[in-house]
Amino acid sequence: MPISTINDSISESSVHKSSIPTKVEMSQNEKYSEAPSEAPTIPPPPEQYAWSRIRENCQDAFSEFFGTFVLLLFGDGVVAQVVLSRGTKGDYQSISWGWGLGVMLGVYVGGKSGGHLNPAVTLANCLFRGHPWRKFPIYAVAQVLGAMAAAAVVYGNYKSAIDAYEGGPGIRTVIGENATAGVFCTYPAEFMTRTGMFFSEFIASTILQFVIFAMADSANIGAGPLMPLGLFFLIFGIGACFGWETGYAINLARDFGPRLVSYMLGYGSEVWSAGGYYFWIPMVAPFFGCAFGGFLYDVFIYTGPSPINTPGMGFGRLVSPRRSTWSNTYNANSPV
């Protein structure tokens, strides 16, 4: 076959192939013979909802609020049951168990924020673990409000029992045989001196923070995921061994919040003056105690990032803090 014939054949074949339609045209009737399928509705991502944005921005405050709320529900609740039943539904060790459970469950609830549940613990984390100082007032306010809300719930739940115990509706006493103010906040034993009151709270708070840092230290044995359970035994131990003299408040939010609620509910100004104006000691001593407990642990045991493990033991940072000191010094998650 001549080359020209072959070329003609190939050319003709190419023409025929190129003439094959690549798109099938549909008539108007065919186009609309079937209803178009609806596209699936995809909900917007959670961050686009207004409440989701609020929850994200206020996550720490909500976590501390509800964590402290749960702590006080169990803590004040067990005191109410033991006191108002006149010891028939529990005893002093029941109170230690109840507070231990309250802390454990509160840490589970408030774990996203670190589960501090205590302004003094938050302070220690700001001082020694790089927790942002700008978050300290947010945590403290949320903790106090959570404690107040829980105290109000406990009061509402036990109001009838309080009336019966006190001797009638509207009778509310702070000191005396039928006093019920101690259900909500702590009052010292009658024999305690002012110095003894302070050091009782100081020592218990020092133990609290020292052991918390030990359990949170991954370079030590550490509690890991069992941290809430470890805190249960820690609080139970403090209550069982150091709680009699002052009631082991060891927490401004736990004491001041319910004390304020009891004042508002009719217990009167004696909630502030009782025990020689004892009310300020649970507000101040835990800060000194937790700071000292954290200091002791970092000086003698801790080897991780801490102002104690810097030149001058962090004193230079205290007298001339850098901006990072007030945001997030170590860029690390704050332990409990």
UniProtKB/Swiss-Prot annotation:
One Gene Ontology MF term: glycerol channel activity
Residues passing through the membrane, by range: 65-85, 95-115, 136-156, 196-216, 224-244, 281-301
Residue ranges annotated as Cytoplasmic topological domain: 1-64, 116-135, 217-223, 302-336
UniProt note: phenotype after gene disruption: Leads to no variable phenotypes.
UniProt cross-references to Gene3D superfamilies, sorted A to Z: Glycerol uptake facilitator protein
CDD domains noted in UniProt: MIP (cd00333)
Chain spans, region Disordered: 1-46
UniProt topological domain (Extracellular) ranges: 86-94, 157-195, 245-280
Motif NPA 2, residue numbers: 251-253
GO CC annotation: plasma membrane
Low complexity: bias regions: 9-19
Superkingdom in the source lineage: Eukaryota
Catalytic activity: H2O(in) = H2O(out); glycerol(in) = glycerol(out)
Membrane topology listed for this record: Multi-pass membrane protein
Span(s) of short sequence motif NPA 1: 118-120
Glycosylation: residue positions: N178
Function recorded in the entry: Probable water/glycerol channel that may have redundant functions with FgAQP4.
Record-stated family: Belongs to the MIP/aquaporin (TC 1.A.8) family.
Record text about domains: Aquaporins contain two tandem repeats each containing three membrane-spanning domains and a pore-forming loop with the signature motif Asn-Pro-Ala (NPA). FgAQP2 has NPA/NLA motifs which is in accordance with the fungal aquaporins (NPx and NxA).
Protein name: Probable aquaglyceroporin-2
Organism of this sequence: Gibberella zeae (strain ATCC MYA-4620 / CBS 123657 / FGSC 9075 / NRRL 31084 / PH-1)
